[in-house]
Amino acid sequence: MLVAAIATVIVLAHLGAQQHRCTQEVTNFSILIDGTEGHNLIDEAAMHRWFKAHGVHPDGLTLDEVNLAELESVAMEHSAVSRANAYMTHAGYVEMNIVQREPIMRFKVDGYDHYVARDGHIFKAMGGYAAYVPVVTGNYKPLFTRDFAGSFDEFIEDSIASMHREIGHCEQLKYPIYRDKNKANSRLKSVRDSVIYKSWFMSEEKHAALVANLELFKEAFAKRKTEEIGKYDKQLASLEKRQERLYDNITAVNKRKGDFENLEKFVNYILRDSFWGAEITQVIISESRAGDMLIKLVPRSGGFVIDFGEVERIEDKFDALSRFYSSVLRSVGWDAYREISVRYDGQVVCREAIKRDGDNSDNNKS
C-alpha cells in the first residue's frame, strides 16, 4: 500500500508539473553576456534581435514550448559566441549565459574585415561593435575567403586534405592511361618483332613481296602507335604537372599557415604585456624578396613607425625597444624620429623626423 501511495504521489506531481509547464508562460527572457573588458562584440539587445530573426525567441511561449537545446544551438551559430547555456525556472524565467569569443587581432586588408579570436576562430566584424585589439593591415592576403567564418586550423586541414584528394584523383586517372600505353607498347613491340619465314615451297619472289608488305605495314602501324603513345604521354604529363602544382600549393599553404601562426604568436606576446598591449595599435605586414613576412608597428605614442622586421627574437627586440623608449625617447621627445628599427640584432636604428642642418642620415642608438 505504501509503495502504491508513493507511486501515486509521484505520478500526480509529474502531471502537476507538466500541467504547469503547459500553462505557465515565459515571464522574462534575460541574457547574461560574459566577455573580456574592451571586447564587447555583442550585447543583450543584439542577441534578442538574433533570436527573433531566427524564430526561436521564447517571448509569448509557454515553458513547455521552449526548446532550450535549440536556443543554445542558435546562439552558437553567432560567430562571436564561444559558449551558451540556457535554463528555465518554475516561475517562468528563461535565462541564458553566453561567453563571447576573445579577439586578439583584426584583419583590415584587401576588402577583409575579420577578427581572429584567441581560440583560432575567425569571424567577420559586426557593425556597431568593436574590440580594442591590434589592427592588421598591409599587403597580407589571408588564406580564407572574405565570407569565411570558422576555425582557421580546420580550414587549413580541410584545404590541404582537399588538395591531397585531388592528387589522389589524378593518380587514379593515370592508371587506365598507363594500362592503355603499356598495351600499345606491347602491341607495337609484337608487330616490330614479327617476321615472315620462307616455306619450302615458297618462291623467293613471293617471300620477298610478303616481307616488303610486312615492312610497309610495320611502318604504318608504328606511326599510328607512336602517335597514340605520344597522346598517352601528354595526358600523363598534364596530370603530373597538375599534381606538382597541387604539391606546390600545399607547400605554399603550409608556409602561409606558419606565417599566420607566427603572427598569432607575435600578437599574443604583445597582448600579454600591459604596456605593449596598450601601445601597439596597428601591425603592417609586407613581404621580403625571399617571401618572408615582415612587420612594422604603429604605436599609440609619437609620430613614428617601428620597423620590427621578421617575426623572430621577439622578446629581445621588445627588450631593446623598451630600453630605447626609456633612455632615448623620454629625453629627445616622442616626435624626434619618423622610424625606429629593431630588425637588426643588437641595435636600434632610427630615422630622424626633421632634417637638421641638411643631414638626413640614419642614427644608430643602442
Language-model features, listed with the residues they occupy:
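Charged, solvent-exposed interaction patches on well-folded alpha/beta domains
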Residues: 1-33, 45, 51-77, 82-366
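Structural beta->alpha junctions
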Residues: 33-39
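Lipid-handling modules and contact-site tethers
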Residues: 42
